């Protein structure tokens, strides 16, 4: 938030003499993320990707189908594929931004500007230093007037990032079960970009957590026309039926 004064002031009388909070906030955000989506705060970067993870993602493509968005291959961390950027790297996004009244603008210097931003992070990121690092970064770049506030109550929920390692015995066992059910080796994602409370299992209970897909990424989740595809539902039923069968089959070796 950049709030400089109370009320707007006529741009013809005060333009050039009053600082523009929207311009200040836009420049502040531009120091956080580059024009190509690369995070500029070093404390926000995750640990380097392991060779095992890179190998697992080899050949994995982001494809939302005919209704999904086109992938911007020049966005994100340079040198990473789109899949690696989503599943092995942190990402920063401006969820909403406002100054003045966009639907009915007036000739006035706005008193404030506000942006709701988000950092999606993977396991290994120093969560406790995310906000302090942002504050230090803004101060070092001359943006002391930009205030960092907590998210609104309706969007304040958060989960700690977690990961079940690729060489976990249960991860390998489930891969074999899925391949038995489908006849096709599964694509393995080391972690997801979404907000999932897996840390309750991996960190609190100390057990592996593994997810099997029941939908696809272009399902308009949390948006109008959220939907599922029946072929994927049928495949998901087969995956889960095969998995539970193998769990109860004494002829199948278990970890």
Residue ranges and their predicted role:
Residues 1-231, 235, 248-255:
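Metal-dependent amide/peptide-bond hydrolase catalytic core
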Residues 239-247:
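C-terminal alpha-helix
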């Amino acid at each position: 938030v950049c709030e400089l004064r109370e009320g707007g002031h006529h741009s013809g009388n005060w333009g050039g003499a009053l600082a523009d909070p929207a311009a200040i906030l836009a420049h502040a955000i531009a120091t956080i993320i580059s024009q190509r989506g690369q995070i500029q705060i070093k404390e926000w970067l995750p640990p380097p990707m392991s060779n095992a993870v890179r190998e697992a993602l080899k050949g994995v493509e982001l494809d939302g189908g005919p209704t999904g968005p086109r992938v911007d291959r020049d966005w994100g961390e340079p040198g990473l594929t789109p899949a690696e950027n989503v599943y092995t790297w942190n990402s920063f996004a401006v969820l909403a931004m406002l100054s003045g009244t966009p639907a009915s603008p007036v000739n006035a210097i706005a008193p404030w500007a506000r942006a709701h931003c988000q950092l999606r992070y993977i396991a290994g990121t120093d969560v406790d230093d995310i906000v302090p690092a942002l504050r230090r970064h803004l101060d070092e770049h001359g943006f002391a007037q930009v205030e960092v506030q907590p998210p609104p109550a309706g969007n304040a929920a958060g989960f700690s990032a977690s990961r079940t390692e690729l060489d976990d015995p249960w991860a390998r066992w489930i891969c074999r079960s899925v391949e038995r059910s489908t006849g096709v080796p599964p694509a393995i994602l080391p972690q997801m970009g979404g907000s999932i409370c897996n840390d309750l299992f991996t960190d609190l209970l100390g057990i592996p957590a593994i997810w099997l897909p029941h939908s696809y990424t272009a399902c308009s989740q949390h948006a109008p026309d959220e939907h599922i595809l029946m072929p994927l539902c049928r495949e998901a039923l087969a995956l889960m039926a095969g998995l539970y069968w193998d769990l109860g089959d004494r002829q199948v070796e278990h970890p």
